[in-house]
């Protein structure tokens, strides 16, 4: 199947490569000419055969809005735009309505898998019409992990990114729990082998998980995380999750506390936040702050604007 990919960064570039390995014809566009197949969005659209599919993997907010606006002028009725970034579900509904006026389909797709997705596959959470999603299934089948799991058509437009938003909120809570446990073990003189304790939990315990595997990997590199500052950024989706909880009158004490702990880390050098920072670097390649300054181990480019769309701020 032929597909255009807009945005060839850490996620988009690997997704394009996985699609190529799966036998798809991928035409990629990026502002960096060194990695782009074409010089403009216009050329990308011209290279694709109708009916076209264009997957957008750029930061949410203004970059996505600008890209969708441009594609709306370039694409034809019957084409489909997929937003695979971390957009707000309210923006999805707006984009879908705008494109529908031109007969262009829209599917939102929350993507999880980080920098490991090229080999392991990406978990996909989609929102859109049944017809549009079914048409895209050859692409989804290639991107997702092997087996029956790893993909869901969560509902209408916006449902995919809403599900991904909640996924990321849960991730905040899990990371915070590991971080607090690590800080307690490090502070105690009872347990002598903290790293070994975490490593032993990877097999047979109820908390075994990929996040735990990544934490042990980080501790292998820096056993006491002495080289890291206790400072953790947030991509914005944790904030959106808490805001959605307020809108729906649903208590989220754990996720809210985890988000606030990240805010506090920017005021005080928090030992627990060293774990959160290390985990973010492990699964997403996000930048970390060392005791010597920036490590240069990755650019922290938030996947979402931290300010919700106007339609949500006003209600």
Report each predicted region and the residues it spans.
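Conserved dinucleotide-binding and phosphotransfer motif residues
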Residues: 22, 102, 248
